């Protein structure tokens, strides 16, 4: 990595004590943020009631099916619309009952506030003009509300709950005033002195200081107003409005409560975002590019990585590296763990992600990079193919130098893998294509101005565990963990049933792209109080001649006609060979094995996670299916035949009363 110049590393000194901070909201009551699930299960089903057999045992079970490929939704736009509409609902619907005695006045307020929100929700892209106009329209609404407040005596006449009217009016005023503050903050976000993450020579204006100033001046006071208004709304009785409007007021309460939660979360997140942009010190990132068509417990095979330096919001470095370069220069022999000993006799960065806890895998990757002569980094970002696929779906096809047509979301992986595995750019530098692909993606992302959707994509990919973040800085790592972005495995409480199935590709190919897996798990409570789990894994290799022709047709459309059979084997036609770990509670006793010989399954212990796991190999040829069933007794039971247990799979916890 190139050393950054001393000018680039120098940061403008801030006034003493003027650092990004989280607004103290401890004195305001607001609903606590909802905790996100740590992992997603695809198509999980739970029985509504237990099934009993003639022997008196009770059965509980679920089914999970993981297809070879599945789409991921982006919900960020809907979340932003919900937030803006929350303001509109309260400002319009709540006022409706109070303004029923002054229709002309009501019309002025509704029109002004509606126009302001529509400027947010209906514009295709946020720009300075739109945001400025929206702020002016919200200001008009605020002026109307001040006039309304002076008419309190008249408004009280005939009102069922007169004491709530002044509070509702003040809440309405707070909301409209807050909306104007949010617009001012949005203008600062949208119109920095230079584009965020741009490359600019020094001297250059600070990008993070104006953002922090606007955050403290406009956003944080607006948050306080929304929380205060929410507190008033939650205590206001529905009887304050006519019965015909009570359902709408109820919905308005819910919307503003959700908006309040979102703003509190953003208030916590924004100072951390500034830190990550290098607001106080330059930040150094290791981005692991993992191929989840060749699975590893911590994501996928690490074929390449990026080194990124951010300083005061500017991108000072972005460089691409082939993992075999740094591994190849490392002369020390570190024996690999037993489970990957058939792949290599030297452990290196490319095989560092062997823990399903992505934080632990990230730490190991940092260790190997430094051990092998690479730079020290502050943070690690783990990214797999699904994240890139969704990014391309968001920004559109990308034109890459040397290709006959742009790369699309559902094509890029096959095309780039073929170019690399065929060594079209030479055996010494097979990944040269990425030196064109990555800048092309970066340029198109900038041109499209996809800032808000990109934040939503990052959040969604982290939720799906296609992306994970790790930081050496304890406060930032704690933030990642609270937001469910660290990929961390949380140790379960004592006497809880746990199930997590992870895979390590051992076949040297990308056949995991065509491998679907079904997990059937049943818990039986016997009359004696013992708990027996039965786990069935059904693994199907979906590669076929049809898939082969699809690959040939796709590559042919890019001008690649003669596809070598050996390369086709690597792309997915080869036999799927995997080392499987089935994580279970510590102390389980294996009772029976079907589909494998008993000697092929060993019980091992993961000290870092505090869990046992069954380890065995699975071999599935193209077009074939393998079914493996394990029966094991849990180390805890129920003396009286009634006990509450939980089954945790991939981090999602469900409770069953038995």
Say what each PLM segment does.
Residues 2, 19-27, 37-46, 59-61, ...:
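Non-catalytic, solvent-exposed segments at the cell envelope interface
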Residues 81-96:
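Sec-dependent N-terminal signal peptides of Gram-positive bacterial secreted proteins and lipoproteins
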Residues 11-17, 34-35:
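Arg/Lys-rich low-complexity patches in intrinsically disordered regions that function as generic
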